[in-house]
């Protein structure tokens, strides 16, 4: 996300660490717009991953996880629960949705997204005594000639922190990617691979609970199984005393699969490469792997 490398975001995180330690915190964030487009447009097309959540809902979700992580001295923090409300377009994509997220006993968030209504498109972090308001947290002053601001309300006093970015929102993102490539880094400290994966998984939970059913996620319709990839059974197998069938020396742990399609894809690949032993302890993934 381009906003991750911008000084407005970095200043916001600094203020969060300074003012919100050891207190109940509520995060409010939204990204939504009204897009009067045809049904075939990507925003309304299930086959093109349409819908508000995947298009721009990823921004407030990623920001909430970032702030929750910052308040816990981590790069990010995943929610422990999500409650979703929303509506579907006639095409089956979500056109508006909201989610209540709980990160811990003292950190929660309310996020919104839409493709049929203009939302506030802001970020608010607040407790009983402090409130931080970030206007345009995604564009970071991009459309105001680089001028950005953060409003801090503390003990009845309002402070406006303002500055101008002379580099540019997307230029900063490009510079970060270029620097990682030149230094041989496989990931950016601004958003790690684990952070990215976590955001993807919670986006899937969000749109799934909103009732969105992408064709690619339905096992029978998934393009994965029509792949031309031909695996080679190269995993070494050994004999186990008392068992007639040879077993692969590599065992597949069934503790991180998040859906039937996810599990089927990984299990199929493992089996086609010669694997045939699965560790399916009932305690894995809160027993969800058995549901």
Which role fits each region the language model picked out?
Residues 62-142, 175-184, 204-205, 220:
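Contiguous beta-strand/loop segments that form the cofactor/metal-binding neighborhood of enzyme cores
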Residues 104, 179-236:
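C-terminal helix-rich "cap/oligomerization" subdomain common to oxidoreductases
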Residues 2-6, 87-90, 256-258, 282-285:
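Short histidine/acidic/glycine/proline-rich micro-motifs that form metal-
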Residues 126-194, 209, 214-216:
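C-terminal glycine/acidic-rich active-site capping loop/insertion
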Residues 220-288:
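N-terminal binding-site loop/beta-alpha segment at the start of enzyme catalytic domains
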Residues 291:
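Calmodulin-binding IQ motif helices
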Residues 3-78:
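Predominantly a Rossmann-like dinucleotide-binding segment in NAD(P)-dependent oxidoreductases
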Residues 7, 11-15, 26, 62-63, ...:
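Alpha-helical elements of Rossmann-like donor-binding domains used by nucleotide-donor carbohydrate transfer enzymes
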């Amino acid at each position: 996300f381009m906003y991750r490398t911008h000084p407005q975001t970095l200043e916001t995180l600094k203020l969060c660490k300074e003012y919100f330690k050891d207190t109940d915190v509520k995060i409010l964030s939204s990204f939504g717009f009204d897009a009067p487009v045809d049904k075939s447009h990507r925003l309304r097309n299930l086959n093109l991953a349409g819908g508000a959540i995947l298009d721009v809902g990823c921004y407030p979700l990623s920001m909430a996880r970032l702030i929750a992580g910052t308040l816990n001295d981590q790069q990010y923090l995943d929610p422990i629960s999500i409650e979703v409300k929303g509506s579907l377009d006639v095409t089956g994509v979500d056109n508006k949705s909201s989610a209540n997220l709980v990160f811990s006993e003292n950190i929660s968030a309310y996020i919104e997204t839409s493709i049929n209504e203009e939302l506030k498109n802001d970020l608010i972090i607040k407790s009983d005594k402090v409130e931080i308001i970030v206007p345009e947290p995604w564009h970071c002053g991009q459309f105001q000639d680089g001028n950005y601001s953060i409003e801090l309300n503390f003990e009845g006093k309002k402070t406006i922190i303002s500055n101008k970015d002379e580099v540019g929102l997307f230029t900063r993102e490009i510079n970060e990617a270029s620097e990682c490539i030149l230094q041989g880094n496989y990931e950016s400290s601004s958003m790690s691979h684990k952070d990215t994966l976590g955001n993807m998984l919670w986006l899937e939970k969000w749109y799934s609970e909103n009732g969105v059913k992408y064709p690619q996620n339905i096992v029978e319709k998934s393009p994965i199984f029509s792949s031309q990839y031909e695996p080679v059974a190269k995993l070494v197998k050994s004999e186990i005393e008392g068992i007639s069938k040879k077993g692969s020396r590599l065992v597949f742990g069934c503790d991180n699969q998040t859906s039937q399609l996810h599990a089927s894809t990984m299990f199929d690949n493992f089996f086609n490469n010669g694997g045939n032993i699965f560790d399916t302890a009932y305690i894995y993934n809160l027993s969800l792997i058995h549901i």
